């Protein structure tokens, strides 16, 4: 089942390139239909009792139901928009227990009568709820590239979203002993049944079980993030799956946190009115008549800045710079081979021998530069610093801006929100990377050279969505993503080695200089 659903991604490429019409052609259409059937069976739109070759009517009805849930035009036809929706990242929990109740509830909302009674029926009729209001939880493991304190902060905040609007209270259980709810990261098949096997990046991000099993599982292969800038936002997915462990099913409201499909972290409240009604229907309003508190999403944009954790028995100076324990926003190197590593509103300078400065505010060196920059590079032609964020660019010569105001990069064809920037010595040009493409800039300006962008496949073995790139004195190019690096042979444009930069690259400043051993 997982492999068949995964083929939808490859089928979509054909569809978007125009090899398939709105209703798939006979040859491609039969294969697409089989993959769509597998998807619809997995998520409960085709009943298990239905024969493996459903009739056209049953298949069309299932497509209609899926289109309605997905806020698509309801046609019953496997068209481009429907197939594209099937490939979007989502929760792995089936929609089976939600569809009929959704239709009933929407009808009630339009009729505007008996609404409260109907809603309560929707959430309580399954009997899947906890019969106590104080619940314990445990974080069993977490992604290696994310700092443990930040992940624990995200978990705590995700539970607090639900306790703020209900009578529930949560506390973290000790490392030993029982816990009502357990949060665990797995890869692939993890003995939950073949239908629940994780499928790598994309597809099903996580799944959970209704009470009172108390389990939520997350795909270890996803590129999890605790910020709004890159990767899948772990906080949003945590909050969604915790909703399932409390007894909530998927919601049809497009703005609901409990909608089946992954939503990005916005600046507004994460819980919709539908989410709040759902949890209150099961557990009641906050105790003592207190008002339900809704926190805006902008408070949860970067959990690593919440980190006040300091392990006992370790001196602060031996813990290494903060970026060593997580990731960074951007990185570059100047003509003296001094590294500049950027994270949030601060930066570090790392000498060639690996000695690291204290973190310094960006505004102390580059006045007017905003926090959380997305890409940085130093031109080895003139030593100027280039910074990129969103659709804007900055150029500094020393501490002084070359341009009075930041420039709009899009005017020259540059991408918005670039992943990384690099001064490439053989071309003596700046290069920007975004997703699966790269852009070569004209010398001394912000114009993209003709015939660009090109595919990242030109850089053999380098992954998409890198977070930084820089040239090394030995002629190699180092690319970074999360906690890993790739070393590229400049002459062959081929990756030769890879590993973990914090423990394997001493010049990154994460090496304990006195002991000569890794910090971790």
Curated annotation (Swiss-Prot):
CDD domains hit by this protein: HX, ZnMc_MMP
Hemopexin repeat copies, ranges: 325-369, 370-409, 415-463, 464-510
Placement of sequence motif Cysteine switch: 89-96
EC number(s) from the headed UniProt entry: 3.4.24.-
MF annotations from Gene Ontology: metalloendopeptidase activity; zinc ion binding
Biological process annotations from GO: collagen catabolic process; extracellular matrix organization; negative regulation of macrophage chemotaxis; proteolysis
Tissue specificity as recorded in UniProt: Expressed at high levels in testes and lung. Low levels are detected in kidney, pancreas and skin. Also expressed in fetal lung, brain, skeletal muscle and kidney. Expressed selectively in keratinocytes. Widely expressed in several carcinomas as well. Is up-regulated in response to injury in the skin.
InterPro entries: Hemopexin-like_dom, Hemopexin-like_dom_sf, Hemopexin-like_repeat, M10A_MMP, MetalloPept_cat_dom_sf, Pept_M10_metallopeptidase, Pept_M10A, Peptidase_Metallo
Annotated propeptide span(s): 23-122
Localization, UniProt: Secreted, Extracellular space, Extracellular matrix
Cellular component, GO, one term: cytoplasm
Signal peptide: 1-22
Residues the entry annotates as binding Zn(2+): 91, 240, 244, 250
Disulfide-bonded cysteines: 324-510
Cofactor note: Binds 1 zinc ion per subunit.
Gene3D superfamilies associated with the record: Collagenase (Catalytic Domain), Hemopexin-like domain
Cofactor(s) the record lists: Zn(2+); Ca(2+)
Keyword Calcium among record annotations: yes
Family: Belongs to the peptidase M10A family.
Function recorded in the entry: Can degrade casein. Could play a role in tissues homeostasis and repair.
Domain notes per entry: The conserved cysteine present in the cysteine-switch motif binds the catalytic zinc ion, thus inhibiting the enzyme. The dissociation of the cysteine from the zinc ion upon the activation-peptide release activates the enzyme.
Record's protein name: Matrix metalloproteinase-28
Organism expressing this protein natively: Homo sapiens (Human)
